[in-house]
Amino acid sequence: MGAVALDHLPEPDRLEVAFAGRSNVGKSSLINALTNQKGLARASGEPGRTRELNFFNVEGGDLRIVDLPGYGYAKAPKPVVEKWTRLTKAFLRGRVNLKRVYLLIDSRHGLKDVDLKIMDVFDEAAVSYQVVLTKTDKIKPPAVKRLIGETGEKIARRPAAFPRVIATSSAKQDGVDQLRAEIVALLPDMG
C-alpha cells in the first residue's frame, strides 16, 4: 500500500519500522532481502523511484515495514520533492506505532551532510533510529570495519540514535539475519 498524504496512511494497528536513506542507497533491495520476497519492494537503478510512503505488512506478524522516499538526488520536480519531504517529516513526527527508523548509508560513500540533516530531524522528533550500512560487498572488509567505527563515533552523542551500527549486503545476504533479529527484538513478546 502506498500513501501520498497523511490521510492515506493505514491504521496504526501494528508496530512499524521504517527504512530511510539517500536515493539509490538500497532500501528496496534490503527490504526484499529481509522479507525473502524478491519483488515486494520495487528496486530500481533510477534514483528517486520511491515517491510515496510504501507500507508492507509482514506475513504472520504484528509488523509493518515502511519504505520512505529517498532523500537527496531525485529525478523529480522540486515541488514534488518538497511534498515528499513534508510528508515524510509529518509521518515521522506523528506516527505513534513507529518503533524505529533504519537509516541506510551506502558504505561506498559513508555519512554525508544530508544524512546528518535527516538525523537532526529524527533527533528533534525523538524518533529512535539505527544506522545500517548497505552494499558492504562493494568495499574491502577492513574499510567496512573502519566505517563502522567512524559512523559509531559520529552518532554516539545523538539523542535518538541506537548505538549499534549494522553492516549489510543485500546481494550477499551479509548482515541481513542480524538486522532481522534486531527488528524481531522490537516486537512485543507474544509468549
From Swiss-Prot:
Residues given in the record as Mg(2+) binding sites:
28, 50
Keyword annotations for this protein, in alphabetical order, are: Cell cycle, Cell division, GTP-binding, Magnesium, Metal-binding, Nucleotide-binding, Septation
Gene Ontology MF terms? GTP binding; metal ion binding
Query: What Gene3D superfamilies does the database record attribute to this sequence?
Result: P-loop containing nucleotide triphosphate hydrolases
InterPro entries xref list: G_ENGB_dom (IPR030393), GTP-bd (IPR006073), GTP-bd_ribosome_bio_YsxC (IPR019987), P-loop_NTPase (IPR027417)
Q: What cofactor(s) does the depicted protein rely on?
A: Mg(2+)
Query: Which residues take part in binding GTP?
Result: 21-28, 48-52, 67-70, 134-137, 168-170
Question: What is the protein name stated in its UniProt record?
Answer: Probable GTP-binding protein EngB
The encoding gene: engB
